[in-house]
């Protein structure tokens, strides 16, 4: 019997099962108070949620989507810097192995690290 290729959503579910979870979803800082006998939409009240008193520190997990995105971009920047260091080491090794020979078909361009890093976005909190 011939096996059909797995459906993309099944494959994604398997991959997500092994993935490290990102930030857990947090409730919105405000919510709409709806009751069974609520008045028309124009009279709905939006009430802010308040944290219990005595909590002055941030929990270890992300507080919201923007914090998760910021942490993700910081990680991507760090990985890009590590990849640049690896490329620089490869380029240096290549020059040491063949001194005086310039290979025009080189797959590693001679770009400086500072030039590439200057094009990375800078984030500040």
Swiss-Prot record:
Keywords: Chaperone. InterPro entries: SSTK-IP. The keyword Protease does not apply. The keyword GTP-binding does not apply. One of its GO terms (molecular function) is protein-folding chaperone binding. One of its GO terms (cellular component) is cytoplasm. Residues 1-22 are annotated as: Disordered. Interacts with HSP70. Associates with HSP90. Interacts with TSSK6; this interaction is direct and recruits TSACC to HSP90. Belongs to the TSACC family. Co-chaperone that facilitates HSP-mediated activation of TSSK6. This is TSSK6-activating co-chaperone protein. The lineage of its organism: Eukaryota, Metazoa, Chordata, Craniata, Vertebrata. The gene is TSACC.
């Amino acid at each position: 019997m011939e096996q059909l290729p797995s459906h993309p959503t099944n494959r994604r579910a398997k991959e997500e099962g092994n993935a490290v979870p990102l930030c857990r979803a947090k409730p919105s800082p405000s919510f709409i108070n709806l009751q069974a006998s609520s008045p028309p939409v124009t009279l709905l009240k939006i009430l802010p949620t308040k944290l219990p008193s005595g909590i002055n520190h941030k929990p270890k997990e992300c507080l919201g989507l923007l914090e998760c995105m910021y942490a993700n971009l910081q990680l991507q920047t760090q990985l890009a810097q590590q990849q640049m260091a690896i490329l620089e080491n490869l380029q240096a090794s290549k020059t040491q192995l063949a001194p005086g020979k310039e290979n025009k078909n080189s797959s590693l361009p001679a770009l400086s690290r500072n030039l590439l890093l200057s094009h990375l976005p800078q984030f500040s909190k």
